[in-house]
A protein has these predicted regions:
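Sec-dependent N-terminal signal peptides
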Residues: 5-13
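Catalytic cores of secreted/periplasmic lytic hydrolases that degrade extracellular macromolecules
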Residues: 19-164, 168, 172-306
Length: 306
């Protein structure tokens, strides 16, 4: 009896190892990040294309490695850049799809009942504000308009688009705006001292480069811009047509409908070349798979997990 009680006592002390569904990585250097990637066998064709499974591990980096810019091998550095961003793009699209499903559920209730609960109306108003859906209509006409517009605006952004735009705006993660401000898309803010002061770009001192708490926040805001700004109406309209045809959303299909005010010459040409050369449409077809990180990290690597 005593032995049984003793065994039970020690069993209670030993906590079972529960496989993580995601890994959030904090400050880290390149060597340790690559050790984590290697431990979870996160390497594929060209190092970053996870084929033929099309599965990516939910390993989410909050920042680029401290010594990322010191990687002298451009091929290796660009591959690591893609490996860092790919899981984040898939995470972001899962988040957007969750929002979309919430709107679709409200739309179905509205279709069936011709009315909505106060909570559902509040959710619609919140989403309409977030995605810049404006109307002076009232009552059910207002709700129908909001639903129709939100179902066009709230949808995934091809991962290849998010990765390439970040690569071109930050010179593949080597720009100071990444290290100093976690900025992937060089978003500007005006008439404020908050943010990074531009260096060698202009004599205009009225704007700053927006900074973020982590690189995911930068990506999240950029996707919201694509899904809400009037500048991207044509992009969203064509995306909606693709969805209606039940065709896979690929960056190569959508890229011609994107226009950025970028100082880079031949931005569209650079965009299409980069997409094709790095075969990033493969990531557009991929998903996150938490089974890939089922093993517990060694103790020496666990300290980098947030």
């Amino acid at each position: 009896m005593f032995v049984r009680l003793l065994c039970l006592f020690f069993c209670l002390l030993i906590k079972p190892v529960i496989a993580a569904e995601t890994l959030e990585i904090g400050k880290i250097n390149t060597q340790k990040l690559e050790e984590i990637f290697s431990f979870y066998q996160y390497h594929g064709e060209k190092d970053y294309l996870m084929i033929p499974e099309y599965n990516y591990p939910p390993i989410f980096c909050n920042y680029f490695p401290d010594d990322f810019t010191k990687i002298t091998d451009e091929k290796k550095r660009n591959a690591l850049f893609i490996k860092i961003l790919a899981p984040l793009t898939l995470k972001l699209n899962n988040q957007i799809l969750s929002e979309r499903n919430e709107i679709k559920s409200i739309a179905q209730d509205f279709k069936n009942q011709k009315t909505l609960s106060p909570k559902q109306i509040s959710i619609l108003e919140e989403k309409a504000k977030k995605y810049d859906v404006f109307t002076r209509l009232q009552g059910t006409y207002r709700q129908q308009y909001q639903i129709d517009e939100l179902l066009i605006k709230v949808h995934v952004v091809a991962p290849s688009i998010l990765i390439i735009a970040a690569a071109l705006e930050t010179n593949w993660g080597t720009s100071r705006i990444v290290k100093e401000g976690n900025s992937l898309y060089k978003t500007l803010v005006w008439h404020t001292d908050e943010g990074l002061k531009p260096i060698g770009e202009t004599e205009d001192d009225t704007y700053r480069i927006k900074t973020y708490p982590n690189i995911y926040a930068s990506m999240e805001e950029f996707a919201l811009k694509l899904n809400s700004s009037i500048s991207f109406d044509n992009f969203r309209g064509f995306r909606h047509q693709v969805i209606e045809r039940k065709t896979l959303l690929l960056g190569s299909t959508l890229a011609p409908y994107l226009v950025w005010n970028s100082p880079l010459k031949n931005y569209a040409g650079l965009f299409e070349y980069t997409l094709s050369y790095y075969e990033l449409n493969i990531i557009d077809k991929s998903i996150l798979n938490s089974k890939m990180i089922a093993k517990e990290l060694p103790q020496n690597l666990q300290k980098f997990i947030m």
